[in-house]
């Protein structure tokens, strides 16, 4: 229906990515972003925390005229960060969860963002290395102007994918960087 009849569909994937413990490795999809990311008109999003889920669902139901794949972590997972009070989900954009000046790291979802956030704290404390951690919930959309603003003068850019290396968000970020120079 999504491709042939041009009908809006909201897909929800659970147990996607590398999940700690829980249901085991045979139930974890690590190829969904690459498999679904190239489907025309299909937007892929993974919320960073419970607070972002409502905005993602509202986007899928009320704002996106095309189909959406919402990638959820369906096991309890506590996060060491909070979204800013004024945070609004905007297509292709995210939000800095932690400021930094030595490097910037883009990630998504509660598992990878939590690990990135905790790693940034260790780097700051033990090595005086300042890592900016950015939540980018859009898995196959990156706003080039926003990306450029987030990077600014920082020369080290990293991504963490909760996915196979090929076809994940990191490739979309790299492609956008090559487009904007």
Which residues fall in each region the model found?
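Thiamine diphosphate
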Residues: 1-15, 20-21, 30, 66-68, 72-181
């Amino acid at each position: 229906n999504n491709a042939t009849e041009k009908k809006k569909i909201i897909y929800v994937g659970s147990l996607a990515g590398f999940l700690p413990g829980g249901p085991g490795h045979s139930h974890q999809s690590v190829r969904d972003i690459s498999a679904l990311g190239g489907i025309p008109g299909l937007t892929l999003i993974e919320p960073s925390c419970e607070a972002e889920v409502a905005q993602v669902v509202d986007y899928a139901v009320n704002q996106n005229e095309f189909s959406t794949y919402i990638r959820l972590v369906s096991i309890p997972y506590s996060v060491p960060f909070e979204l800013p009070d004024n945070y609004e989900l905007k297509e292709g954009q995210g939000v800095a969860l932690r400021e930094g000046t030595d490097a910037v790291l883009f990630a998504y979802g509660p598992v990878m963002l939590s690990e990135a956030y905790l790693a940034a704290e260790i780097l700051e404390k033990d090595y005086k290395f300042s890592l900016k951690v950015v939540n980018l919930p859009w898995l196959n959309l990156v706003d080039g102007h926003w990306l450029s603003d987030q990077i600014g003068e920082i020369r080290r850019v990293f991504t963490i994918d909760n996915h196979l290396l090929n076809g994940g968000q990191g490739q979309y970020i790299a492609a956008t960087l090559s487009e904007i120079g």
